[in-house]
């Protein structure tokens, strides 16, 4: 029996009568992607070991040896010298095996009162907590870039659209502030998600807890968790916190995708509202004149990638009975890639927005088309006593006449306007034309949330204060 205890094999191999096949080893191993968790795995193990020593479950000398060994392993990992082994399955057993090789039996005592089930759940939460904080910072950087651009263009007039048809004049600054609002809600979702991530699973062991006199609250305090997972079965089995983060990330990417669609449209020569810096574009291998907006196009495409990860994680969880199942090994790659995709995209977009070249004249020329001030004419009539529905009908008839002539409402003389609006001619005075200018239109929307330059600047100031 003694010889069997010292026989080399997997951490659980004593139960089995034959070794795992090489094909199954490759199929079930996760070390070449979950090694990303190595540093948080060490952090969690050190907190666990300190608690074991404080509770007299392991000796103080064992703790000292574990701390010394882990410091060496951390250095090896950071220097790229650590040798990851497929035969050891995952990040946890690779580190434990190296620790035991360095310090002997003390390394074997580290796993007392712990399972890989609660260990990996702790690792993921520790890692994801840090990534949420990083993404929150990147969302702040993007919003800051948008606010800078919005402030510079508080009075730059462009057409506002509904159904991709010219609707009413707005300012470019106001348009950009819409995305600031979206990304602000994204940041709030990340903060809210973090609250549920920041709970300690360690101590749940495999599923039922442990018979050792552990102190979960001490470990939670050491690792900076807000509290512990209240139920051991739930602690090791559910990945709803990862799903919630991925859902929040999918919304970030959805907002990025909407913005990307507009950047691509605005940069098109047929629109020409903006230009992107060359470093964010590519050329064509056959057409020498091309400058393609590859970054926003690729971000638009990567949104589908993150959406796919969300569906993958939801599908992963939906059929699992309690408690832990091997299915959960598949949670990491979608989660890791979601973090990478969102973080890289936000970082690139913050820099890209700062380098946007705005073409105010092209925006203004476009806003002069499509009868963008027709609603202002209707409002003019309403303010002189006409019911809005009657004003709407009268202006719509005038628009139809102008469309047939190929002119704008502002191109009509006062006499022509009174003629086309004969039923309400008595309400139309010389001042009507001030309502039909682009500047007059945007200036009239002077209320919180409106597009007036004054309101845009106030909104920028408020948003900057909120970011502090």
UniProtKB/Swiss-Prot annotation:
Gene3D superfamilies per UniProt = Fumarase/aspartase (C-terminal domain) (1.10.40.30), Fumarase/aspartase (Central domain) (1.20.200.10), Fumarase/aspartase (N-terminal domain) (1.10.275.10)
One Pfam entry for this protein is: ASL_C2
Example GO biological process: arginine biosynthetic process via ornithine
What keywords are assigned to this protein? Amino-acid biosynthesis, Arginine biosynthesis, Cytoplasm, Lyase
Top-level enzyme category: lyase
> What is the reaction catalyzed?
2-(N(omega)-L-arginino)succinate = fumarate + L-arginine
Q: Which InterPro entries match?
A: Arg_succ_lyase_C, Argininosuccinate_lyase, Fumarase/histidase_N, Fumarate_lyase_CS, Fumarate_lyase_fam, Fumarate_lyase_N, L-Aspartase-like
Q: Where in the cell is it found?
A: Cytoplasm
* Pathway(s) this gene product operates in, as recorded in its UniProt entry: Amino-acid biosynthesis; L-arginine biosynthesis; L-arginine from L-ornithine and carbamoyl phosphate: step 3/3
* Molecular function GO labels: argininosuccinate lyase activity
Family label: Belongs to the lyase 1 family. Argininosuccinate lyase subfamily.
* HAMAP family, alphabetized: Arg_succ_lyase
PANTHER family noted in UniProt: ARGININOSUCCINATE LYASE
This chain belongs to the protein called Argininosuccinate lyase
